């Protein structure tokens, strides 16, 4: 008998230990699900509704993630919503970026640490006023590819990408101890022409395979049967989006036609609206947003405020709409937190509304970050683009009988220089012409170093030029951002059609893909000798409206003896026209004060240095404010206040811009403006 007890004692101890452990695991099991009987979410078995705000980690530097998230929490939000831009993480096939500003896992973990839940929107298409709606440009290497469909080439790329991304997200799901409560599949698919349910089913299966059967998957579409017809799919919970101009009852009735039971959800309640170059800055009155938010919350609905902070389209990440209208660098969105993360009147008004329904955290709200006006900084001309081709295109040009697109020369963003020779004398001005929509998006034209003007997509398609037979014809073509919404997201860039000179097709092109990023980062002003006046002839003979595209460089030091520097600032461009600007190799984005409405660019403090002078590099594309005779006129100014909504915008040289290419949402009914988008 004692021997028997000795043998079974370990087993008895194991059973005693196992019982409490299993009970504890069941007691602490995390669950987030839909209770269809009570029309609500259940969080760990208790009724729950989220009040969320959109923040795009790709538009806010990592340096400021915690600051922005804390401000969102202190506003009374219990969740955030964010997109995952595919092209932000896989710039080239199989080359992934998940560190520093691209570290989405850290961003989500940080939200979790701060007590915020997450609504994740991993696409693969996201819209978001982001370059190509988040789809990587390299997909267009298959020229006939049908994006956002069951096209085999597209599905293969999507399957591979989601096979990388979603396993990273699975440990962050709520039921696995993380913050992610729901995951969106695709994005407003009902607004796309393809209406391919096989594609949606493929995504549904892929998401389930990688994330499991317990996670709540959902779709978002405009609150109208037209959009829900192709956007909703059985097995994915249907949600809607609408703004202050919509009838809330009608909007949620649209959702109810697809989801008779379950929580009411507005996945994008618009706190503001997007901007386009050459159009007035969009705003929505605080009172209208607050009133509509109150009405939504009074119905017991879950809601996401799009945007709560907009942020910045750094570098080349802005998108565009059709008819072609590119979005500016600022994505301020008239949101409750400004582009720079500052508290606004709208922030406090919405906090007060939320406080009527949910407990708002106590304690101090993180203040707006201080700004500093560093003043005027002189710049000098470094080199024209044409004089720097050995630096900008070290691998050499590509020869082609006819023009090639950016994708065909392995260039995704930025600039490509197209060069040929004039086949005939043009002593009298001869028309250089592109078919309508043949230049994507702007071409800066010169003949033998003499600026001739600009060809512009959908706008200027013919330019009269002069020159002798055999003269060098240069077109520096700029990608202004790929279309992010609608049927034309397969937006090829460059010279996408043949050009003609007096009706004769131009051939024998030499094409230079320009690596401006590496040139700026690697050289930062050390490009050998500067231009020494040998282009003065171009100044003398060119139209007064244009100069050759050229790089300019300047340096400034952070003042000593002032505590807490560096601080955020804004760079202003008095007298400059259009171009790209870098500080210490960081691509701030596009400036275009000649067109507006944005006149300043946000400069976050973390890119500035106190230990050494800071280097400003500018690529001015149209006209600098100085010449070799007046170099002191080349300057920028650092100010402590943004100007993103100039009241009057003028195109270069001096003509008013046609406004409202894409209407802002009216205050009455969003359904009407959706018909125009």
Swiss-Prot record:
Positions annotated as active site in the UniProt record: 188 (proton donor), 268 (nucleophile)
Binding site for substrate: 83, 129, 187, 333
Propeptide: 24-28
Entry's EC annotation: 3.2.1.23
S-S bonds: 195-230, 626-634
Glycosylation sites: 26, 247, 464, 498, 545, 555
Signal peptide, first to last residue: 1-23
Entries under InterPro entries matching the protein: B-gal_1-like (IPR026283), BetaGal1-like_ABD1 (IPR048912), BetaGal_gal-bd (IPR048913), Galactose-bd-like_sf (IPR008979), Gly_Hdrlase_35_cat (IPR031330), Glyco_hydro_35_CS (IPR019801), Glycoside_Hdrlase_35 (IPR001944), Glycoside_hydrolase_SF (IPR017853)
UniProt-listed GO biological process terms: carbohydrate metabolic process
Top-rank taxon: Eukaryota
Pfam family for this entry, one: BetaGal_ABD_1
Keywords in alphabetical order: Disulfide bond, Glycoprotein, Glycosidase, Hydrolase, Lysosome, Signal, Zymogen
Region (Disordered): 654-677
Subcellular location: Lysosome
GO cellular component annotations of the record: lysosome
Main localisation: other
Catalytic activity: Hydrolysis of terminal non-reducing beta-D-galactose residues in beta-D-galactosides
Annotated Basic and acidic residues bias: 668-677
One annotated GO molecular function: beta-galactosidase activity
Family recorded in the similarity comment: Belongs to the glycosyl hydrolase 35 family.
Oligomer status and interactors: Homodimer. May form higher multimers.
Function, as annotated: Cleaves beta-linked terminal galactosyl residues from gangliosides, glycoproteins, and glycosaminoglycans.
Record-given protein name: Beta-galactosidase
This protein's encoding gene: GLB1
